[in-house]
């Protein structure tokens, strides 16, 4: 544990280079296969922003009922504080692969705050078929396979199995279970290094997937000695099972809100933020690759300059596709459709409908930092954070014929003295266009401290936001007008 905390502190201070040294000529590891893989069961401890939050476990075994096939079982368990709530997360995956690590079948289960999502499927010669179940809803989907397809878990094995050598780059098509997307993973073998942060020497491998980069130091025998993600904010290192599982004790004693501390964009005070109708804001260190979905923003070098004006109409567009039910907002689900109609009895306009939905949610859905996969999860638990509120509002509104989309960005938090990442809605009002609505704050017209950055509700659509967290800073902000 001491090693992990030391690594995190050093890397966040920008001194990583002084802790890694060239280890001389790299050896050529012996050829290895899944059958000869030396480590069948590995545990790692996970640290986020200076606090131990969980562990991971990876097992490799021959498939009992399928000769010549192998199973990679992966598990990640985490516990952390967020906005005063004790959050528990468990990710479990079983990938069945061929001897060359290409994917054959898979079964994933994601559990957050008691809500579950399951993804199961198989990869054929040209098509990947899978089913997603969450909140009582299910979707069957297919994706086209154009080249050999690997599970994300195979990335830990591929460098060694394909002949690890400094200066080489490999590209693989990977199915990413958390986002249910096929994406290209790029792996560079960068160096052969030693470090006081781990024993011996190891190959430094940089992996890029879905715009995110992790760096792993892999020993000659295939063990992942150290791994860094989110620019060093997440650190994992090998531990024995007893030490890895001890995170439960440490997490129960941890009262720091590590997630808020890491993600908060500190800013000067904004008085009465929920009444701000026009605001200027400049964000520093904004990634050039991030496609901002906001007509009120413009790029100037590595800055994003935005004017949010609630008197100006939002961009127009075809709203009809935002009536369709989705896994996150299953507007055709009976319990959602029936309740929406009951809430809306007697309404004579879309504006009145929106007001009634917000009033009902304010009275019946508690505002707690509890995650959900679907609007049905929120309705049954009667509590949610901002994303869950946006899911439920979208499901209600779509069930009543109001095109509604889910958007993401930042909004000012008075208790925290800065901007937090936030999710809200935009509802289509005939003759006016898109209107920002925030069910968390009960706003039929969201205030101008809401800075929309990206639209979307699926995990795949939201991945780009991860590159902003802990990186972007507020250079200046000014509230120009209030209601």
Give, region by region, the residue ranges found by the protein language model.
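Acidic/charged, solvent-exposed loop-and-adjacent secondary-structure segments enriched in E/D, K/R, S/T
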Residues: 132-153, 357
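Acidic low-complexity segments
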Residues: 295-383
């Amino acid at each position: 544990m001491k090693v992990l905390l030391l690594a995190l502190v050093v890397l966040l201070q920008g001194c990583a280079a002084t802790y890694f040294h060239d280890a001389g000529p790299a050896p050529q590891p012996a050829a290895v296969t899944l059958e000869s893989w030396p480590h069948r069961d590995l545990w790692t401890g996970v640290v986020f922003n200076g606090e131990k939050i969980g562990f991971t476990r990876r097992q490799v075994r021959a498939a009992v009922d399928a000769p010549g096939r192998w199973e990679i079982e992966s598990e990640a368990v985490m516990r952390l504080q967020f906005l005063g709530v004790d959050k528990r997360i468990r990710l479990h995956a079983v990938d069945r692969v061929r001897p060359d690590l290409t994917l054959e079948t898979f079964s994933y289960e994601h559990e957050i705050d008691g809500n579950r999502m399951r993804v199961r499927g198989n990869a054929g010669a040209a098509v990947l078929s899978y089913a997603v179940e969450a909140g009582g809803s299910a979707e069957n989907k297919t994706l086209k396979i154009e080249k050999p397809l690997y599970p994300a878990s195979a990335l830990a094995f591929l460098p060694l199995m394909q002949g690890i050598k400094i200066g080489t780059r490999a590209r693989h098509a990977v199915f990413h279970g958390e986002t249910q997307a096929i994406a290209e993973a790029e792996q560079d073998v960068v160096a052969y290094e030693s470090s006081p942060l781990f024993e011996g020497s190891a190959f430094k491998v940089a992996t890029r997937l879905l715009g995110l980069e992790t760096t792993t130091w892999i020993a000659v025998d295939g063990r992942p000695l150290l791994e860094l993600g989110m620019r060093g904010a997440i650190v994992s290192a090998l531990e024995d099972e007893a030490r890895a599982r001890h995170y439960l004790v440490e997490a129960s004693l941890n009262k720091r809100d590590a997630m808020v501390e890491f993600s908060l964009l500190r800013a000067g005070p904004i008085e009465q933020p929920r009444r701000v109708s026009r605001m200027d804001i400049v964000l520093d260190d904004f990634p050039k690759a991030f496609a901002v979905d906001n007509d009120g923003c413009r790029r100037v070098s590595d800055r994003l300059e935005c004017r949010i004006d609630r008197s100006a109409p939002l961009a127009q567009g075809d709203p009809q596709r935002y009536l369709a039910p989705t896994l996150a907002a299953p507007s055709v689900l009976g319990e959602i459709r029936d309740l929406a109609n009951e809430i809306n009895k007697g309404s004579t306009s879309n504006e009145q409908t929106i007001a009634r939905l917000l009033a009902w949610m304010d009275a019946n859905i508690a505002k707690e930092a509890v995650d959900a996969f679907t609007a049905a999860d929120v309705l049954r638990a009667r509590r949610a954070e901002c994303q869950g509120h946006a899911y439920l509002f979208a499901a209600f509104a779509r069930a009543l014929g109001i095109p509604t989309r889910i958007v993401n960005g930042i909004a000012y938090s008075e208790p925290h003295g800065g901007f937090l990442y936030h999710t809200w809605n935009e509802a289509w009002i005939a003759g006016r266009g898109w209107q920002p609505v925030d069910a968390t704050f009960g706003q039929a017209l969201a205030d101008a401290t809401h800075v929309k950055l990206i639209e979307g509700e699926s995990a795949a659509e939201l991945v780009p936001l991860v590159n902003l967290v802990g990186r972007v800073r507020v250079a200046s902000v000014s509230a120009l007008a209030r209601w």
